[in-house]
Amino acid sequence: MRNAIKTVGIVFGGVSGEHEVSIKSARTIIHALKHPININKFDVISIYIDKKGKWWPSEIAEKVLESDPNFDKNIFFKQVEFIGLDHLPKETEKIQIWFPVLHGPNGEDGSIQGFFQLTGKPYVGSGVLGSALGMDKIAMKAAFSAAGLPQVNYCEIHSIDLLDKKRLSYLIQKIETQLGYPCFIKPANLGSSVGISKAYDKKELLNGLDLAAQLDSRIVVEKNIKARELECAVIGKKQIKTSCVGEVRYSSDWYDYDSKYSKNSTKTLIPAPIPEKISKEVQSLSILACKAISAEGIARVDFFYDEEKDSLWINEINTMPGFTEQSMYPMLWDASGIDISQLVARLIESA
């Protein structure tokens, strides 16, 4: 029946460095919602947030989705009569369920979730707390530690520490003693490996800290370990379900931004060629990781696996994983018997 159809607001774009990834993910999700099995379940209203934070209605959002991601949006916007609003497009009043397809700051850090909460309408994914903890690597690691979950050794640094020579010298010595080289330097609140660097000596460490500090005031430095990288997808709120476990192998020195979004630089193995015992442990730890930070609805949990030591460590949790052609989240569910059209429907129904 027509009145049973739900109107879903797909919000994409955003002000973060993962703007283009968000556009690609939104394309995939909207295409899945227009599949024959979903056409009589959902109406879609697409809302585009440009890089300056302005919200644009479906008229323009659809043009963004249809166009080459490299086209000049500023020129395009000048050609249409409708000009961007500082407030919400009027058609958002029709939206019954929000589906934020936003990555990085302001998209999966609790900001947009707080806004959705104020509208009184349900939304796909974690709430404010789960999103905030899942975005900030320092807070996430603290929550994992409190839950007794295995992690690689790390140190936390604040950008203000870099201005105090004595404090910085102490922290460098601490990193060299506790973590050693090589090590990874990560901005605490960015995704898709944006701003991450690998340091093999003190000079590279200092350069990596400077780079991270330009992007975030909170920085994580992690010990480098020789390990395989495993991933597990999660869905559900009251009952959390896990997918099969996948593995990512890459030709570069580490799993950087280019590796994540280039077809030729990575190889995915689904299911991962690992012992069943390890696979079950990954699935179990994935559920515990979600509970530790109050993540729900959708998540992907990443792990390090040292097969020689038969050891697992949680790397991080992503509370709004990508839906691009190279994204593991939909591929893991597809291999688990849930295709993309079924998956997006389940995510909306779990809101």
UniProtKB/Swiss-Prot annotation:
Top EC class for this record: ligase
Known pathway: Cell wall biogenesis; peptidoglycan biosynthesis
Location (main, coarse): cytoplasm
Entry's Gene Ontology cellular component terms: cytosol
Cofactor: Mg(2+); Mn(2+)
Sequence positions that bind Mg(2+) 1: D302, E316
Residues noted as binding Mg(2+) 2 in the record, renumbered to the chain: E316, N318
Details of cofactor binding: Binds 2 magnesium or manganese ions per subunit.
BP GO terms, sorted: cell wall organization; peptidoglycan biosynthetic process; regulation of cell shape
NCBIfam families on file: D_ala_D_alaTIGR, PRK01966.1-4
Name of protein: D-alanine--D-alanine ligase
Organism: Prochlorococcus marinus (strain SARG / CCMP1375 / SS120)
Gene: ddl
